[in-house]
């Protein structure tokens, strides 16, 4: 029986040093039916040369999406949408790589569970720049034995799904649409969108290798990531499960968030917001004013 086609999209930006390891891991898959799409967002190193040499040397067919001008990750991903031919799809950064059985086990899982399941993810090893296994600082193996209902609910509390481990139904990917071009937490956004329409499942095995780099993320970018993460949690929380954490963040960072219109606007729209806190933000009250007002109102309720 013919196996369903899986599209693997490799995305690179200055990953020349790791590219061969990634591509070799795709070639080594035990699963036979793979469409390879390779994309590069105008790397400053010799990534495209490495791609071309590897593809020629291995006589491996691939669709190429190589940029001469840097456009950003989400634009690159959106372009690759239109190149996907498989029933299933995996996106992977070129500095990560896969266990030989990763695709086969993920396809088998989704085929077994049926169309109600939009994606599957696995556990992952964390590795350093020498491909040595190291400590998993992101705690990506925290969801091992959750039920589908628990996964659906807890995903709103935070992202514990490593993007390189995910295999999606292409139908689920296309139903949830292309990425907003201004988003930087694109993987978490995608899981939350799929979570609205499909069940998500996991395989509690380490079937991928996630590379941790030694350089530090800038403080500005870290703040942007935290801000966007919080906005996504407010947008997708349908039950109030994240209310306590969200309210606490706004209280602890009252002065800072009061100056952030994007965050405040989303908080006003959050169905489970602290109404007194929202009111004080609206009137630009100092935090002491919120505490006094909150205390007064609580004495009458």
Locations of regions flagged by a protein language model:
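Cell-envelope/extracellular polymer assembly enzymes that use nucleotide-activated donors
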Residues: 4-7, 35, 189
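Short aromatic/hydrophobic "clamp" motif used to bind/position activated sugar donors
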Residues: 89
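Conserved donor NDP-sugar-binding/catalytic core segment of glycosyltransferases
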Residues: 101-135
């Amino acid at each position: 029986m013919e196996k369903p086609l899986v599209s693997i999209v490799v995305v690179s930006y200055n990953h020349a040093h790791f590219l061969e390891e990634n591509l070799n891991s795709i070639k080594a898959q035990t699963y036979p039916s793979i469409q390879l799409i390779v994309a590069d967002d105008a790397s400053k190193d010799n990534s495209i040369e490495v791609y071309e040499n590897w593809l020629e040397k291995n006589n491996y067919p691939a669709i190429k999406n190589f940029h001469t001008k840097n456009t950003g990750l989400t634009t690159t991903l959106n372009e690759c949408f239109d190149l996907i031919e498989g029933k299933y799809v995996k996106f992977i950064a070129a500095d990560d790589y896969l266990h030989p059985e990763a695709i086969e086990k993920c396809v088998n899982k989704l085929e077994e569970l049926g169309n109600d399941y939009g994606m599957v993810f696995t556990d992952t090893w964390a590795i350093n720049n020498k491909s040595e296994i190291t400590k998993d600082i992101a705690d990506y193996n925290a969801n091992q034995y959750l039920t589908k209902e628990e996964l659906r609910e807890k995903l709103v509390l935070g992202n514990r799904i490593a993007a390189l481990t995910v295999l999606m139904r292409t139908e689920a990917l296309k139903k949830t649409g292309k990425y907003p071009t201004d988003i930087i937490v694109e993987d978490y956004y995608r899981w939350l969108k799929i979570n609205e329409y499909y069940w998500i499942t996991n395989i509690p095995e380490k079937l991928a290798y996630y590379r941790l780099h030694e350089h530090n993320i800038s403080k500005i970018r870290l703040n942007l990531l935290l801000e966007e993460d919080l906005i996504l949690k407010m947008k997708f929380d349908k039950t109030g499960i994240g209310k306590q954490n969200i309210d606490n963040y706004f209280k602890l960072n009252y002065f800072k968030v009061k100056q952030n219109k994007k965050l405040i606007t989303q908080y006003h729209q959050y169905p489970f917001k602290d109404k007194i806190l929202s009111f004080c933000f609206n009137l630009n009250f100092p935090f002491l004013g919120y505490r006094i007002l909150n205390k007064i109102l609580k004495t009458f309720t």
